[in-house]
Amino acid sequence: MNDIRIIKQSEYDDAKRVWRLCFPDDSDEFIDYYFARRTSPELILGAFSRCGELIGTLHLLPREISFLGHPKRICFVAGVGTVPSMRHKGIASAMFEAAYPLMKKRGFCASILQPFNVGFYERLGYEPFVYAGIGEINTACLLGVPLPCVVAPDADKMLSIYNAFMRPFTGFALRDKACFENLISEFSLSGSVTVMTENSYAFCCIEGSCANVYESAGDITTSLTLLASRYSSVKALVPTLYSDVFGVKQSVFNMIKVIDEDVLISHTGFSTAAEAVAHAKKTALSFDKY
């Protein structure tokens, strides 16, 4: 490997090739959507072999989150992958080391990601931030809940539900109508479904007779009841305060690394990032995966 840099427009198809090799379970339909709507060449850090072949990528996605009641610009890291033939050579770690100064240059005060391996990212300076209940829902807790009426997905209503649901929490992405329009489009792809009631919504991926809930907000009991009436099992991510209610295990969902301490703690009342992050963890919630 002799180069780690932001890829060029002419290398964008190569980045898609790397994604396919690194994440073979993703459909071509989803990959095409992701590269058309969620990322772009200037957001992709690439690792190149000595002969100039793209062998690894790391996506630096700009986000704005609510952090202790204040908007903060962060970098959400996604699509970290090295082609199978070049793994276990320290390439992913090298990409992260190259990414940190670039993140600061671009004005990000922190980096957040969903870990595939908590220990790996802890070695890179990340720490657990968002915990969530993740697993198969105990549908017995939904017995007796009236089956809700279904309404057509509506981006404006989803945004209103999301904002109200997230208000007690911190660490969540600040969204707009366009974000929900994109999510509705994404979850209209093959193998996905969106369900919405008057006071809740859920974005799901379907595997056989199982609904895997990517995100659910509002009165989540109503959307989960609706899904339980359609599928034999429902797996979901829920805030930790619902973990016992739905019988799911609490796990690390997102990790954080401080990039610019002064910017992160500005207006929070804390004198160090360590104190601010420790306090934020108590009520942190996010649905972002990629």
Regions found by a protein language model. Give the residues of each.
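Conserved GNAT acetyl-CoA-binding A-motif
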Residues: 96, 101-115, 231-240
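Residue-level recognition of the GNAT/N-acetyltransferase active site
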Residues: 83
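Amide-forming acyltransferase catalytic core, primarily the GNAT-like/NAT-type
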Residues: 127-223
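Short hydrophobic/aromatic beta-strand element in the GNAT-like acyltransferase core
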Residues: 42-46, 57, 79, 191-196, ...
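Short amphipathic alpha-helix that is part of the acyltransferase structural core
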Residues: 1-62, 69-76, 142-178, 208-211, ...
